[in-house]
Design a protein with these regions (language model features):
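Conserved, compact domain cores that house catalytic/ligand-binding motifs in diverse enzymes
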Residues: 132-210, 215-216
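Low-complexity, Pro/Ser/Thr- and charge-rich linker/hinge segments at domain boundaries
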Residues: 37, 114-143, 215-216
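Hydrophobic beta-strand positions that form the internal "hydrophobic ladder"
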Residues: 186-187, 229-232, 292-296
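Contiguous beta-strand segments within globular domains
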Residues: 38-59
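Multi-bladed beta-propeller domains
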Residues: 30-40, 73-89, 156-173, 201-219, ...
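C-terminal motif of bacterial Sec signal peptides marking the signal peptidase cleavage site
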Residues: 15-18
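Short, conserved, GDST-rich strand-edge loop motifs in beta-rich repeat architectures
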Residues: 131-144, 234-256, 298-302
Length: 302
């Protein structure tokens, strides 16, 4: 019996500490301006399953109170730096307000007094966002490329997982990954320098292609899949970098030569056209229309 009483008291104490009561401050003045936040989320339209829109307030203040209100129980947060929204309560609030809107009110404490900004809104869509976003994770400089990975993030949370890390491929350069209409079962990406080649994933099979031919400028570079999954358009480029003395981190990347080719997956053949490979032009960044009937690209004189 004593053991049961102990657990009851423990649960009660956890409940008291877990449900923090945010006392509403006495507002000295309404500022009648919007708070300066980063990222600039004011007026955003949110998919109903998006992860919490955490942000930083860039105005001056010693402490912040943020109230997110709509149908259902509001969320009240106090912060001194970044505003981190609890994910469970965020999901409940989005679900209750899909097709409606949320009002966000920010109050600032300065020298012991509270000031309130004008509220801004987030509209909540009834539509959901795709489950994942894939990207290359690399340090923000051209030099440190020996540590990188192709990653994916679950967009309903902040869970990040690796698709492939270059620690497993000889610390080479891995880049230019694309999917066919967002389908993770049809993917390509390039590996440079060590173990060089184009990795092609389709139909449960994975193969590495040597894509340089005597008739093309380079190995495959920037890709886009035909919606049928039967072909991929690639650019072939000779790329250079220029550096500025005025600022060491300003880099210009440009092509000295550039063509577009089409790769037939089933035949393992490459072909092109004078419209896509003109010696007097630079053709780049191919992109198929959603119905696959048009191929768009950038072109300019050399």
């Amino acid at each position: 019996m004593r053991l049961n009483i102990f657990y009851i008291l423990l649960i009660a104490l956890c409940g008291l500490y877990g449900c923090k009561n945010h006392q509403q401050p006495i507002i000295k003045e309404n500022l009648n301006i919007l708070p300066t936040i980063y990222p600039e989320y004011q007026g955003a339209l949110l998919p109903v399953n998006i992860a919490p829109l955490n942000f930083k307030i860039q105005d001056e203040g010693d402490e912040w109170m943020i109230q997110i209100q709509g149908k259902g129980n509001p969320i009240t947060i106090t912060a001194h730096d970044a505003v981190e929204i609890p994910i469970k309560r965020w999901r409940q609030l989005l679900h209750q307000n899909q097709g409606g809107s949320l009002s966000i009110t920010v109050s600032s404490r300065k020298k012991g007094e509270w000031y309130q900004y004008s509220p801004f809104t987030w509209d909540v869509s009834t539509d959901s966002i795709d489950s994942h976003l894939a990207y290359r994770l690399i340090e923000p400089t051209y030099a440190n490329w020996n540590s990188m990975a192709i990653c994916q993030r679950e967009l309903s949370s902040f869970k990040e997982t690796e698709i492939i890390s270059n620690k497993k491929s000889g610390q080479n350069c891995i880049n230019c990954h694309t999917f066919n209409q967002g389908n993770p079962n049809e993917m390509d990406m390039h590996m440079r320098k060590i173990n060089a080649g184009t990795i092609l994933i389709q139909g449960g099979a994975c193969q590495k292609l040597n894509t340089k031919t005597p008739h093309t400028i380079s190995n495959f570079v920037y890709p886009d899949w035909h919606p049928s999954g039967k072909q991929i358009a690639f650019s072939t480029n000779l790329t250079q970098m220029s550096f500025y003395d005025a600022h060491p981190k300003i880099i210009e990347v440009y092509d000295t030569q550039s063509d577009i080719v089409l790769y037939d997956i089933s035949k393992n053949e490459v072909y092109t056209s004078p419209l896509l490979a003109n010696a007097n032009k630079l053709e780049n960044f191919p992109f198929f229309s959603p119905d696959g009937k048009q191929l768009y690209f950038c072109t300019c004189d050399r």
